[in-house]
Every structure is written in C-alpha cells, then in structure tokens.
C-alpha cells in the first residue's frame, strides 16, 4: 500500500491553495465543502475566487508566493501551471511537516486527492495512487450509480436512532437485521429527502415495531428494451439489493449479470403462444417469496405497466397485503424507435402515438377506423404473428397501402435488425423477422434513412 487512506477533519483549520485558475477552483470547492478556513494565493484569480472572497468564504492573497503563508496551515495544495513554483510550494510545506498536494505530480506530493463520492456523512474515496486518474474516475462513476442519492440522509438519521435501536433489540443479530431493513427502505429515504416528518415518524415506528421475520416486499422493475445501459439508476439499485429476482425472456443477459451474485434467480420466461410459467403461477411465486420475508424484484422487459401485466401481478400482492413499489423502465416503443432512427412524433407527420398490443383477450377487437387515421404513429407490441391481419384491417379501414412501416427485431441490442417497407408488404416482411419484434406504422418511418444512427456505430 503506497498511500494510507484517511479522512481529515479540516473544519475551521487553516489551509492554503497556491493557484488562481480552474484547477485551483476545483480544489477550493472541496476544501470549502469540508469547512476549511481557506487562503488562496496567486498572481491573478478567475472570477469565482473573487465571488467567494466577496461572500467572506475565503481570503485572497494576490502576488508572488511567500513561504510564510504556510506558517499556520494544516494542509496545502499547489495548483499552478508553473512546475518550478509547485515544487517550491511542496518543499516549503515539507520543511514545515505540512501535507501538500501537487496537482498532476503525485511524486512531488505528500498526499494525493482521491475521486470522491459524497453522500455525507457517508463518504467513499477511490484512488489509483496517482497512476491512472481516469480509471479512478470510471470506478467512481460506477459506484455513484449503485449508491442512492439520499443515502447520506438515511445514514445521518440512522445515527440519531442508534440509542433507541440498542434499547429495542437485545442482540447484535437483531440490530443488524433492523439496520438492513432501514437502509433499503425506499419510503424512508424519500420521506427524509422531502423532510416529511409525519411520514418519517410513521415509517420509523413501523420498522422498529414490526417483527423481524415480517412479510417481505416486491419491487416491480422495468428492465428497459434490451441495452443494459438503458436500465434506470433506480432499477440497478433494486436488483443489487434483491434476495430473489423473478425475470422473463425479454430481460437481457447483460442486465442479469448486474443482479446481486447471491440472489436467487427464478426464470418465468414466456413466448407468444407458449407460456413457460402461467401468469397465475407467477403471481403465486411473488406472493410466496415475499411471505418468506424476502425482498423480491419482479424484473420485466420494457416498462412493467405497458403490456407487461404488471398491474395484474400487483393486484395479487395488494389483495394479500404485501408491500410493493414500481420502478418504471424505458418501454420498447421508445427504445426501439430511437435506436432505429424513427421519431414517434413529428410536427409534420404525427401529432400522436398509439401503443397497441397484438394480443387481445378473447372477443376483443381494435378500433380499426380510428387506427387508420392520418397524422399518428402506430406501435404494435407482440404483433408479429398478426401482421397480415393488421395489414388487412388497416387497409380495409382507409389507411393508404403505401404507408411506411418498419419492424424492429431485438431492439437496442447489438443484434438489432430493422426491416422497412410499405403497409401492403407488412405481412410478407413479418415472415422475415423473429420475436421479440415491434411493428411501427406511420409517416415518421420515412425519416429512418436520414436519422438512423445506431446501425452506423
């Protein structure tokens, strides 16, 4: 270990930055956030430093560097574009046993600045020892995505509860289980973020007083259309916290690779015309796992409330009194159209968009007359097997046969395939494609040749 990671208490302690440019400004923000009593020395300053000085947040010393500026300091940073001056600052600090950071010169510094994830009072620092700052930044970004934005407020609140929790729960095991519940409770985090004291109190009392082996909860998470990069930040956090993940065929392997390693995985994949697991059985799986006290994520392709039968699953949980929440996802219509260069709406071609399922309950019939109207875009989910019928019905109800159409297979994935043509060709085009596919019908499809960006990557 080349460097010892430490967290310094700098509040109301004298610190010095030598340098008045953009790099010095970034360092100054960190020291000000830490409550340091900051002096900045430079020949000239960018406007932000002047604004801070006018607000009484720091002291500016304009002119050449003088070693006496270090006499009362606990910490110094050399952040000029003059290597000789930076070295001089470092040597003067070293002589006074003051830790000094030299920007972009780790070998000349007695300490280095890590990449920081600030969820105060929770702080995470990532460092490559100065060998690869870009790698440290990339790791910080990945960790940022895993830590909820309001986690710091929850951590601070937890500190206020420690005494009561110690009284309420006799053993370390019980306390640990309580804290695990508290830190993953979305309602408490949101209540703290909104400063909703009533909700904070209610949620806290519920968490403290309910049995530790209480019923679990189910989180319905939309996985998006395929590309793992389109999974929402909150969706990622939920699958990282799950005890059980119940998922279907439309969830990509890349997304499943993000699931917590020790979580149980239950595949309930379905295909058009063939159900691996009946819907009622899926409902019972969710219910059964939650009743064991587990945190269950029902992971569904696209958005769970758009042709995902999410509402049916939640009704079962609601009737059984199981707590649940929903994390929406990017629906296939948005993802597939964007990755195919087809805007769903356009001032010249479409003032509305219709999302339509290719599957209806027995006896169901679509309003084909309204669907055949101009100035709109139609998006058919699960319509591949019904493409010939869709073609026939729309033409019968007045849609022009030359209306542009596109079919998107495996939308947003690296294996995405798009085929386009006219409405009179739709049934024939569908025979060339495989599920999962999405059908898009409307004048906006004609923009695809101009706006198709994804196939060029």
UniProtKB/Swiss-Prot annotation:
SUPFAM superfamilies membership: NAD(P)-binding Rossmann-fold domains, Siroheme synthase middle domains-like, Tetrapyrrole methylase
GO terms classed as biological process: cobalamin biosynthetic process; methylation; siroheme biosynthetic process
Active-site residues, record numbering mapped to chain: 248 (proton acceptor), 270 (proton donor)
Catalytic activity: uroporphyrinogen III + 2 S-adenosyl-L-methionine = precorrin-2 + 2 S-adenosyl-L-homocysteine + H(+); precorrin-2 + NAD(+) = sirohydrochlorin + NADH + 2 H(+); siroheme + 2 H(+) = sirohydrochlorin + Fe(2+)
Any Pfam family hit: NAD_binding_7
Annotated positions binding S-adenosyl-L-methionine: 225, 301-303, 306, 331-332, 382, 411
Region: Uroporphyrinogen-III C-methyltransferase, residue numbers: 216-457
Functional note: Then it catalyzes the NAD-dependent ring dehydrogenation of precorrin-2 to yield sirohydrochlorin. Finally, it catalyzes the ferrochelation of sirohydrochlorin to yield siroheme.
PANTHER family attached to this UniProt entry: SIROHEME SYNTHASE (PTHR45790:SF1), SIROHEME SYNTHASE-RELATED (PTHR45790)
Protein name: Siroheme synthase
Organism: Shigella sonnei (strain Ss046)
Name of the encoding gene: cysG
């Amino acid at each position: 270990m080349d460097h010892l990671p430490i967290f310094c208490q700098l509040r109301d302690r004298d610190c010095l930055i030598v340098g008045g440019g953009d790099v010095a400004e970034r360092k100054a923000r960190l020291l000000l956030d830490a409550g340091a009593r900051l002096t900045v020395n430079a020949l000239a300053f960018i406007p932000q430093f002047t604004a801070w000085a006018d607000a009484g947040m720091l002291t500016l010393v304009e002119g050449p560097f003088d070693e006496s500026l270090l006499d009362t300091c606990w910490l110094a940073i050399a952040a000029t574009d003059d290597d000789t001056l930076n070295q001089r600052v470092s040597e003067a600090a070293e002589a006074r046993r003051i830790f000094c950071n030299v920007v972009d010169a780790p070998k000349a510094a007695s300490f280095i600045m890590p990449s920081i994830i600030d969820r105060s009072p929770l702080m995470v620092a990532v460092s490559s020892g100065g060998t690869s700052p870009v790698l440290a930044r990339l790791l910080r970004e990945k960790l940022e995505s895993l830590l909820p934005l309001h986690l710091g407020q929850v951590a601070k609140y937890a500190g206020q509860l420690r005494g009561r929790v110690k009284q309420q729960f006799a053993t370390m095991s019980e306390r640990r289980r309580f804290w695990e519940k508290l830190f993953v409770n979305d309602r408490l985090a949101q209540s703290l973020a909104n400063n909703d004291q009533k909700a904070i109190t209610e949620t806290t009392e519920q968490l403290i007083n309910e049995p530790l082996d209480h019923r679990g909860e189910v989180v319905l998470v939309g996985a998006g259309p395929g590309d793992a990069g389109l999974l929402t930040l909150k969706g990622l956090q939920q699958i990282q916290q799950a005890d059980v993940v119940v998922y279907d065929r439309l969830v990509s392997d890349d997304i499943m690779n993000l699931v917590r390693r020790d979580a149980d995985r239950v595949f309930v994949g379905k295909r058009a015309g063939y159900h691996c697991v009946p819907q009622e059985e899926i409902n019972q799986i969710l219910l059964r796992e939650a009743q064991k006290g587990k945190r269950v994520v029902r992971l569904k392709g696209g958005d769970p409330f758009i042709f995902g039968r999410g509402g049916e699953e939640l009704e079962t949980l609601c009737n059984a009194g199981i707590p649940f929440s929903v994390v929406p996802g990017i629906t296939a219509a948005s993802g597939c159209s964007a990755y195919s260069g087809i805007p769903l709406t356009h001032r010249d071609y479409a003032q509305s968009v219709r999302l339509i399922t290719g599957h209806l309950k027995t006896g169901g019939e679509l309003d084909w007359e309204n669907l055949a109207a101009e100035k709109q875009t139609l998006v058919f989910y699960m319509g591949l097997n019904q493409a010939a019928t869709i073609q026939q019905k729309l033409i019968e109800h007045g849609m022009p046969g030359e209306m542009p159409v596109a079919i998107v297979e495996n939308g947003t994935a690296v294996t995405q395939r798009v085929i386009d043509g006219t409405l009179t060709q739709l049934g024939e085009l569908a025979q060339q494609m495989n599920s999962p596919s999405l059908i898009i019908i409307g004048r906006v499809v004609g923009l695809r040749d101009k706006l198709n960006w994804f196939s060029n990557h």
